[in-house]
């Protein structure tokens, strides 16, 4: 009896082993395309920079006067600063401001990363824009109107004004407490 039971178990195991399963695991998978590592050009550019260049990119400086001077050139050439912020003391007219910003960008052409050229243009009493530009209401006055569309349009006007001079960063709006 034991012999028959043992033979039956062996036959059952062999029969189960011979069954052809038709599931997804047995299907032949199409060959996968080789994975191509995506190259991030920004990461690649940063890896090529020296430590001094990386540190310089963290610094934004102001400058004196209405024109590019030796001190500003030194900041660009020697220290590879990340950008400049212009204040009212740097802005006389639209033409002069455009000339200053273009000369900063031109002086930076040899560097790997373009400069941030910033301004703090909030509207109202905090305005750095030349006299030729539209004077805009304060953020408080814009808020009192209580209109998202109006606030959006004021923001667009500020953006277009500073963009027309070559600025690429604005430190506004802010919430002063």
Segments the model singles out, each with a brief description of its role:
Residues 39, 69-70, 98:
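Structural motif corresponding to alpha-helix initiation and N-cap regions
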Residues 1-4, 8-9:
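Positively charged n-region of N-terminal signal peptides that target proteins for export
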Residues 61-62, 67, 72:
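Domain-core and long-helix interface of multi-subunit machines
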Residues 75-177:
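Enzymes and membrane/adaptor proteins characterized by extended Gly/Ser/Thr/Asp/Glu-rich
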Residues 14-17:
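C-terminal motif of bacterial Sec signal peptides marking the signal peptidase cleavage site
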Residues 2, 19-20:
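C-terminal non-catalytic regions of proteins with extracellular/luminal or membrane-system context
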Residues 20-49, 54-56:
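N-terminal, intrinsically disordered, polar/charged segments of Gram-positive cell-envelope systems
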